[in-house]
Amino acid sequence: MTHVPVLYTQAMEGLRVVENGTYLDGTFGRGGHARGVLQLLGPGGRLLVMDKDPEAIAMAERAFSCDPRVVIRHGSFALLAQLAAPQSLDGVLFDLGVSSPQLDVPERGFSFVKDGPLDMRMDPEMGESAAQWLARVSEREIADVLWTYGEEKQSRRIARAIVAYRANQPLLRTVQLAELIASVMLRTKSGACKSRIHPATRSFQGIRIHVNRELVDLEVGLEAALAALRPGGRLVVISFHSLEDRIVKQFISRHAKVPPTNRRLPEVQTFVPLLRMIGRAIKADEDELEVNPRARSAVLRVAEKLDVLEAVR
Protein backbone atom coordinates (compact mmCIF):
# COMPACT_ATOMS: atom_id res chain seq x y z
CA MET A 1 0.00 0.00 0.00
CA THR A 2 1.39 3.41 -1.03
CA HIS A 3 1.99 5.83 1.82
CA VAL A 4 0.01 9.08 1.48
CA PRO A 5 1.57 11.94 3.46
CA VAL A 6 -0.37 14.38 5.62
CA LEU A 7 -2.02 17.20 3.61
CA TYR A 8 -0.70 15.65 0.39
CA THR A 9 -3.15 17.24 -2.05
CA GLN A 10 -2.77 20.68 -0.49
CA ALA A 11 1.03 20.39 -0.58
CA MET A 12 1.02 19.50 -4.30
CA GLU A 13 -1.33 22.39 -5.05
CA GLY A 14 0.89 24.72 -3.03
CA LEU A 15 4.04 23.70 -4.92
CA ARG A 16 2.31 24.33 -8.27
CA VAL A 17 4.67 21.96 -10.08
CA VAL A 18 5.63 22.90 -13.64
CA GLU A 19 6.69 20.22 -16.10
CA ASN A 20 10.31 21.32 -16.56
CA GLY A 21 10.86 22.81 -13.11
CA THR A 22 13.44 22.03 -10.44
CA TYR A 23 12.21 21.11 -6.97
CA LEU A 24 13.51 20.14 -3.54
CA ASP A 25 11.89 17.68 -1.15
CA GLY A 26 13.92 18.44 1.97
CA THR A 27 12.34 15.69 4.09
CA PHE A 28 12.02 12.56 1.93
CA GLY A 29 10.59 10.28 4.65
CA ARG A 30 8.74 7.50 2.83
CA GLY A 31 8.79 9.41 -0.46
CA GLY A 32 5.10 10.26 -0.78
CA HIS A 33 5.69 13.89 -1.72
CA ALA A 34 8.61 13.01 -4.00
CA ARG A 35 6.45 10.57 -5.96
CA GLY A 36 3.76 13.23 -6.31
CA VAL A 37 6.23 15.76 -7.70
CA LEU A 38 7.71 13.22 -10.13
CA GLN A 39 4.26 12.37 -11.48
CA LEU A 40 3.88 16.02 -12.47
CA LEU A 41 7.42 16.55 -13.83
CA GLY A 42 8.32 15.95 -17.45
CA PRO A 43 11.58 14.47 -18.78
CA GLY A 44 13.28 17.86 -18.41
CA GLY A 45 12.28 18.33 -14.79
CA ARG A 46 14.51 17.73 -11.80
CA LEU A 47 13.94 16.72 -8.18
CA LEU A 48 16.49 17.01 -5.38
CA VAL A 49 15.62 14.89 -2.35
CA MET A 50 17.25 15.18 1.07
CA ASP A 51 16.80 13.62 4.50
CA LYS A 52 18.76 13.43 7.75
CA ASP A 53 17.75 9.80 8.16
CA PRO A 54 20.04 7.31 6.36
CA GLU A 55 17.18 4.79 6.22
CA ALA A 56 15.05 7.31 4.32
CA ILE A 57 17.93 7.93 1.92
CA ALA A 58 18.35 4.17 1.39
CA MET A 59 14.64 4.00 0.53
CA ALA A 60 15.04 6.89 -1.91
CA GLU A 61 17.95 5.16 -3.62
CA ARG A 62 15.97 1.93 -3.98
CA ALA A 63 13.01 3.79 -5.44
CA PHE A 64 14.62 6.43 -7.66
CA SER A 65 18.27 5.56 -8.38
CA CYS A 66 17.34 4.75 -11.99
CA ASP A 67 15.38 7.97 -12.55
CA PRO A 68 17.71 10.54 -14.20
CA ARG A 69 15.52 13.39 -12.95
CA VAL A 70 16.28 12.62 -9.29
CA VAL A 71 19.32 13.72 -7.27
CA ILE A 72 19.59 12.15 -3.78
CA ARG A 73 21.60 13.65 -0.93
CA HIS A 74 21.93 12.54 2.69
CA GLY A 75 21.75 15.44 5.13
CA SER A 76 19.61 18.09 6.74
CA PHE A 77 17.82 20.66 4.61
CA ALA A 78 19.85 23.18 6.61
CA LEU A 79 22.65 22.25 4.17
CA LEU A 80 20.56 23.31 1.17
CA ALA A 81 22.81 26.29 0.42
CA GLN A 82 25.67 23.85 -0.29
CA LEU A 83 23.60 21.95 -2.86
CA ALA A 84 21.44 24.50 -4.68
CA ALA A 85 22.64 27.68 -6.35
CA PRO A 86 20.80 30.95 -5.67
CA GLN A 87 17.53 31.26 -7.61
CA SER A 88 17.79 27.72 -9.02
CA LEU A 89 14.64 26.11 -7.58
CA ASP A 90 10.98 26.40 -8.55
CA GLY A 91 9.71 24.89 -5.33
CA VAL A 92 10.84 23.75 -1.88
CA LEU A 93 8.94 21.42 0.45
CA PHE A 94 9.68 20.79 4.13
CA ASP A 95 7.52 18.21 5.94
CA LEU A 96 8.74 18.71 9.49
CA GLY A 97 8.87 16.60 12.63
CA VAL A 98 9.27 12.88 13.10
CA SER A 99 8.23 10.49 10.33
CA SER A 100 5.92 7.50 10.69
CA PRO A 101 8.73 4.94 10.17
CA GLN A 102 10.75 6.59 12.93
CA LEU A 103 7.79 6.44 15.32
CA ASP A 104 6.70 2.95 14.34
CA VAL A 105 10.09 1.22 14.65
CA PRO A 106 10.94 0.84 18.38
CA GLU A 107 14.66 0.48 17.67
CA ARG A 108 14.81 4.11 16.53
CA GLY A 109 14.04 5.23 20.08
CA PHE A 110 11.33 7.82 19.35
CA SER A 111 8.29 6.04 20.79
CA PHE A 112 7.18 6.27 24.41
CA VAL A 113 4.69 3.43 23.83
CA LYS A 114 6.93 0.83 22.17
CA ASP A 115 10.09 0.01 24.10
CA GLY A 116 13.42 0.60 22.44
CA PRO A 117 16.85 2.13 23.03
CA LEU A 118 16.61 5.77 24.16
CA ASP A 119 18.12 7.26 21.01
CA MET A 120 15.81 9.72 19.15
CA ARG A 121 18.45 10.72 16.57
CA MET A 122 17.16 11.09 13.03
CA ASP A 123 20.70 10.33 11.91
CA PRO A 124 22.06 7.67 14.32
CA GLU A 125 25.63 8.54 13.29
CA MET A 126 25.37 12.21 14.26
CA GLY A 127 25.71 13.72 17.73
CA GLU A 128 24.59 12.37 21.10
CA SER A 129 21.68 10.01 21.64
CA ALA A 130 18.95 11.04 24.05
CA ALA A 131 20.34 8.59 26.62
CA GLN A 132 23.84 10.06 26.34
CA TRP A 133 22.55 13.60 26.66
CA LEU A 134 20.34 12.83 29.68
CA ALA A 135 23.26 11.10 31.42
CA ARG A 136 25.58 14.07 30.95
CA VAL A 137 23.73 17.36 31.44
CA SER A 138 22.57 19.19 34.55
CA GLU A 139 19.08 19.19 36.02
CA ARG A 140 18.65 22.80 34.96
CA GLU A 141 19.56 22.09 31.34
CA ILE A 142 17.10 19.19 31.18
CA ALA A 143 14.36 21.39 32.64
CA ASP A 144 15.14 24.19 30.18
CA VAL A 145 14.90 21.85 27.19
CA LEU A 146 11.63 20.30 28.37
CA TRP A 147 10.16 23.76 28.96
CA THR A 148 11.49 25.48 25.82
CA TYR A 149 11.06 22.73 23.23
CA GLY A 150 8.40 20.55 24.85
CA GLU A 151 6.36 23.33 26.47
CA GLU A 152 6.12 20.99 29.47
CA LYS A 153 4.72 22.76 32.55
CA GLN A 154 6.19 20.14 34.90
CA SER A 155 9.67 20.45 33.40
CA ARG A 156 11.43 21.12 36.71
CA ARG A 157 9.81 18.17 38.50
CA ILE A 158 10.56 15.83 35.62
CA ALA A 159 14.18 17.02 35.40
CA ARG A 160 14.61 16.52 39.14
CA ALA A 161 13.23 12.98 38.86
CA ILE A 162 15.53 12.14 35.94
CA VAL A 163 18.63 13.28 37.82
CA ALA A 164 17.59 11.35 40.95
CA TYR A 165 16.88 8.22 38.89
CA ARG A 166 20.17 8.29 36.99
CA ALA A 167 22.10 8.49 40.27
CA ASN A 168 21.07 4.88 40.90
CA GLN A 169 20.78 3.40 37.41
CA PRO A 170 21.17 4.60 33.81
CA LEU A 171 18.21 5.66 31.66
CA LEU A 172 18.66 3.57 28.53
CA ARG A 173 15.16 2.61 27.30
CA THR A 174 12.24 4.66 26.00
CA VAL A 175 9.58 3.02 28.16
CA GLN A 176 11.86 3.39 31.17
CA LEU A 177 11.87 7.18 30.67
CA ALA A 178 8.17 7.29 29.77
CA GLU A 179 7.19 5.46 32.97
CA LEU A 180 9.38 7.75 35.06
CA ILE A 181 7.72 10.83 33.54
CA ALA A 182 4.25 9.31 34.02
CA SER A 183 4.98 8.69 37.69
CA VAL A 184 5.93 12.36 38.12
CA MET A 185 2.82 13.57 36.32
CA LEU A 186 0.56 11.38 38.46
CA ARG A 187 1.91 13.12 41.56
CA THR A 188 1.07 16.60 40.23
CA LYS A 189 -2.21 18.43 40.71
CA SER A 190 -2.99 18.23 37.00
CA GLY A 191 -2.63 14.45 37.00
CA ALA A 192 -1.67 12.45 33.92
CA CYS A 193 -5.07 10.77 33.77
CA LYS A 194 -6.79 14.11 33.14
CA SER A 195 -4.83 14.80 29.95
CA ARG A 196 -5.86 13.57 26.52
CA ILE A 197 -2.24 12.96 25.55
CA HIS A 198 0.32 10.55 26.98
CA PRO A 199 2.11 12.18 29.96
CA ALA A 200 5.50 11.75 28.26
CA THR A 201 4.47 13.36 24.96
CA ARG A 202 5.80 16.86 25.59
CA SER A 203 9.01 15.70 27.27
CA PHE A 204 9.84 13.32 24.43
CA GLN A 205 9.12 16.09 21.94
CA GLY A 206 11.43 18.49 23.74
CA ILE A 207 14.31 16.01 24.00
CA ARG A 208 13.90 14.96 20.36
CA ILE A 209 13.91 18.55 19.09
CA HIS A 210 17.04 19.33 21.11
CA VAL A 211 18.95 16.18 20.16
CA ASN A 212 18.28 16.76 16.44
CA ARG A 213 18.65 20.57 16.48
CA GLU A 214 15.33 20.70 14.67
CA LEU A 215 14.42 24.35 15.25
CA VAL A 216 17.95 25.56 14.51
CA ASP A 217 17.93 23.60 11.26
CA LEU A 218 14.49 24.96 10.40
CA GLU A 219 15.59 28.58 10.74
CA VAL A 220 18.71 27.97 8.64
CA GLY A 221 16.77 25.91 6.09
CA LEU A 222 14.09 28.56 5.58
CA GLU A 223 16.69 31.23 4.83
CA ALA A 224 18.49 28.85 2.46
CA ALA A 225 15.22 28.01 0.71
CA LEU A 226 14.41 31.68 0.20
CA ALA A 227 17.82 32.26 -1.39
CA ALA A 228 17.53 29.17 -3.61
CA LEU A 229 14.04 29.91 -4.94
CA ARG A 230 13.53 31.63 -8.27
CA PRO A 231 11.04 34.51 -8.48
CA GLY A 232 7.63 32.84 -8.63
CA GLY A 233 8.95 29.74 -6.85
CA ARG A 234 6.92 28.29 -4.00
CA LEU A 235 7.86 27.44 -0.40
CA VAL A 236 5.60 24.83 1.22
CA VAL A 237 6.08 23.88 4.88
CA ILE A 238 4.09 21.37 6.94
CA SER A 239 4.63 21.69 10.69
CA PHE A 240 3.32 19.56 13.54
CA HIS A 241 3.59 21.68 16.67
CA SER A 242 3.30 25.32 17.66
CA LEU A 243 7.04 25.99 17.93
CA GLU A 244 7.68 24.94 14.32
CA ASP A 245 4.63 26.73 12.99
CA ARG A 246 5.51 29.93 14.85
CA ILE A 247 8.96 29.98 13.24
CA VAL A 248 7.49 29.39 9.77
CA LYS A 249 4.74 31.98 10.23
CA GLN A 250 7.15 34.62 11.54
CA PHE A 251 9.65 33.90 8.76
CA ILE A 252 7.04 34.39 6.04
CA SER A 253 5.62 37.49 7.72
CA ARG A 254 9.09 38.99 8.18
CA HIS A 255 9.78 38.77 4.45
CA ALA A 256 6.26 39.60 3.28
CA LYS A 257 5.05 42.46 5.47
CA VAL A 258 6.39 45.95 6.07
CA PRO A 259 7.85 46.04 9.61
CA PRO A 260 6.39 48.59 12.04
CA THR A 261 8.25 51.90 12.10
CA ASN A 262 8.99 54.35 14.88
CA ARG A 263 7.73 57.78 13.85
CA ARG A 264 10.36 59.46 16.03
CA LEU A 265 13.21 57.86 14.10
CA PRO A 266 14.16 58.62 10.48
CA GLU A 267 13.38 55.91 7.94
CA VAL A 268 16.71 54.36 7.00
CA GLN A 269 15.75 52.21 4.03
CA THR A 270 12.77 51.08 2.00
CA PHE A 271 11.44 47.62 2.87
CA VAL A 272 11.51 45.24 -0.11
CA PRO A 273 9.24 42.20 0.34
CA LEU A 274 10.75 38.92 -0.82
CA LEU A 275 7.75 36.66 -0.20
CA ARG A 276 4.01 36.70 -0.74
CA MET A 277 1.77 34.63 1.50
CA ILE A 278 -0.46 32.27 -0.48
CA GLY A 279 -3.79 31.82 1.30
CA ARG A 280 -4.18 31.02 4.96
CA ALA A 281 -2.73 28.25 7.08
CA ILE A 282 -4.30 24.91 6.12
CA LYS A 283 -5.24 22.07 8.48
CA ALA A 284 -6.46 18.55 7.81
CA ASP A 285 -10.21 18.09 7.43
CA GLU A 286 -12.30 15.46 9.21
CA ASP A 287 -12.06 13.00 6.32
CA GLU A 288 -8.26 13.00 6.48
CA LEU A 289 -8.25 12.79 10.27
CA GLU A 290 -10.33 9.61 10.13
CA VAL A 291 -7.70 7.99 7.91
CA ASN A 292 -4.65 9.51 9.62
CA PRO A 293 -5.11 10.74 13.23
CA ARG A 294 -1.49 11.97 13.25
CA ALA A 295 -2.61 14.76 10.93
CA ARG A 296 -4.53 16.46 13.74
CA SER A 297 -1.74 18.88 14.64
CA ALA A 298 -0.47 19.46 11.08
CA VAL A 299 -0.41 23.01 9.68
CA LEU A 300 0.55 23.80 6.07
CA ARG A 301 1.76 27.23 4.97
CA VAL A 302 2.63 28.40 1.45
CA ALA A 303 4.61 31.42 0.28
CA GLU A 304 5.80 32.60 -3.13
CA LYS A 305 9.15 34.22 -3.92
CA LEU A 306 8.76 37.70 -5.38
CA ASP A 307 10.79 39.34 -8.12
CA VAL A 308 12.78 42.02 -6.30
CA LEU A 309 12.64 44.39 -9.28
CA GLU A 310 8.87 44.04 -9.48
CA ALA A 311 8.53 44.44 -5.69
CA VAL A 312 10.29 47.84 -5.62
CA ARG A 313 8.24 49.34 -8.45
Curated annotation (Swiss-Prot):
Species of provenance: Xylella fastidiosa (strain 9a5c)
EC number of this enzyme: 2.1.1.199
UniProt-listed Gene3D superfamilies: Putative methyltransferase TM0872, insert domain, Vaccinia Virus protein VP39
InterPro entries registered for this protein in UniProt: RsmH, SAM-dep_MeTrfase_MraW_recog, SAM-dependent_MTases_sf
Annotated residues for binding of S-adenosyl-L-methionine: G31, G32, H33, D51, F77, D95, Q102
Location(s) in or outside the cell: Cytoplasm
Top-level class of the enzyme under EC nomenclature: transferase
HAMAP family: 16SrRNA_methyltr_H
One cellular component term from this protein's GO annotations in UniProt: cytoplasm
Similarity-based family: Belongs to the methyltransferase superfamily. RsmH family.
Name recorded for this polypeptide: Ribosomal RNA small subunit methyltransferase H
GO biological process: rRNA base methylation
Catalytic activities: cytidine(1402) in 16S rRNA + S-adenosyl-L-methionine = N(4)-methylcytidine(1402) in 16S rRNA + S-adenosyl-L-homocysteine + H(+)
Molecular function terms from GO: rRNA (cytosine-N4-)-methyltransferase activity
Entry keyword set: Cytoplasm, Methyltransferase, rRNA processing, S-adenosyl-L-methionine, Transferase
